[in-house]
Amino acid sequence: MLFPRIIAASAQRKLSVYLKKGGLVAYPTESCYGLGCLPTLAKALGKLAHLKKRPQHKGMIVIGNQFEQLQPLLQMPSENLQDMLRKEWPAPKTFLLSAKSCVLPELRGKQRSKLAVRVPAHVGARRLCQALQTPLVSTSCNRAGKRACRTEREVRRQFGRDVWIVGGRIGRQKSPSQIIDGETGKRLR
């Protein structure tokens, strides 16, 4: 089954509808639970920033099940860069790549032209994107100043019923993903 094993097909459809209405979802990733939404809905991005108490000028990461799922958001990278990304991913490595002009400023960050994208090493996160047939925003699941949630229980404590929770185990990664400028190769985190 392509979807994380704990969610039935009917729940998958309900989650898809919920996200299209601007809902937020928490799901396991490499190092913690991620908090996300559809990357194309300004309403959902605003809701996510408000819930996390996150400044809206900061950009957000978008994950996909493979590079091709992220391409509609990106200006076409060079063939060399595409080859490198396909070799690097899946991995806890986020790359900043030139975004298409249609990408919402709330997503890439105000006054920024690049978008942070990743194909995660966490198989459940990739399967979630594959099953929903869409990339997802992926920020750490926590309110500003609090530790990132590492369990479903911690998500419930911090966010209650404000988010749809996809249960599962996080990966073994201890630190957040690296962030690398795709054009310069410079490591930013």
UniProtKB/Swiss-Prot annotation:
UniProt cross-references to PROSITE patterns, sorted A to Z: YRDC
SUPFAM superfamilies per record: YrdC/RibB
Reactions catalysed: L-threonine + hydrogencarbonate + ATP = L-threonylcarbamoyladenylate + diphosphate + H2O
Domain YrdC-like: 9-189
A GO molecular-function annotation: L-threonylcarbamoyladenylate synthase
Keyword set, alphabetical order: ATP-binding, Cytoplasm, Nucleotide-binding, Nucleotidyltransferase, Transferase, tRNA processing
GO BP terms in the entry: regulation of translational fidelity; tRNA threonylcarbamoyladenosine modification
Top-rank EC class of the record's enzyme: transferase
Pfam family, one: Sua5_yciO_yrdC
HAMAP family assigned: TsaC (MF_01852)
Function according to Swiss-Prot or TrEMBL: Required for the formation of a threonylcarbamoyl group on adenosine at position 37 (t(6)A37) in tRNAs that read codons beginning with adenine. Catalyzes the conversion of L-threonine, HCO(3)(-)/CO(2) and ATP to give threonylcarbamoyl-AMP (TC-AMP) as the acyladenylate intermediate, with the release of diphosphate.
Protein's name in the database: Threonylcarbamoyl-AMP synthase
Protein source organism: Neisseria meningitidis serogroup B (strain ATCC BAA-335 / MC58)
Lineage, opening ranks: Bacteria, Pseudomonadati, Pseudomonadota, Betaproteobacteria, Neisseriales
Gene name of this polypeptide: tsaC
